[in-house]
Amino acid sequence: MKSTYIIGEIGQNHNGSVDIAKLIVDLVSRPVREEVFNLELRPMDAVKMTKRDLSEELTDSQMNRPYDSPHSFGRTYGEHRAYLELTDEEHFDVYKHAKSLGLDFVETLCSKGCMSLLKLFTPDRLKVASRDLTNLPLLEVMAETKIGRASCRERV
């Protein structure tokens, strides 16, 4: 029987820090000991990160909106969101770390502008964000990469 393929979602939990992202990768790569039922769960198979291009995602008014939450990383919503983003090079750094631990690397690319990341490395799989399931221009660009399991001919 095949085992379930488990992906550890990093998302924005790295708070804009490569070191935190790598720590999460370290944790995902370890088995989990569950003491109540005396189980040892195997490590996850992959980690997933998300790459966004805020200039394609947010309007000027959204970017410049004051953002004074106690948990804000900037004076405006744009500054806050920009702080949380890792660069292409930082994604590559996390990718290399994950691969060194034997993990697959999955990437959600949220816009065509994010395809620049693919100049540095090729993730094992691409994931489509649920909000982009009908974003045909993005889906076509992602399918053309031939990363993962589907091709342009297989699209619906």
Region locations from a protein language model:
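Generic N-terminal amphipathic, Lys/Arg-enriched alpha-helix
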Residues: M1-N13
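Hydrophobic faces of well-ordered beta-strands that scaffold small-molecule active sites
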Residues: I6-G8, D45-M49, F105-T108, D124-V128, ...
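Conserved, mostly hydrophobic/aromatic
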Residues: E9, V28, L118
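Glycine-rich, proline-tolerant flexible connector loops at the mouths of alpha/beta enzymes
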Residues: Q12, G16, E35-E85, C114, ...
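Glycine-rich anion/phosphate-binding loops
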Residues: N15-P31, D88-E89
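Active-site-adjacent beta->alpha loops and helix N-cap segments on the catalytic face
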Residues: S17-D19, D88-H91, C114-S116, V128-K146
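A structural motif corresponding to the C-terminal end of an alpha-helix
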Residues: V36-L41, E89-F105
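Residue-level detector of conserved catalytic or cofactor/ligand-binding positions
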Residues: K146-V156
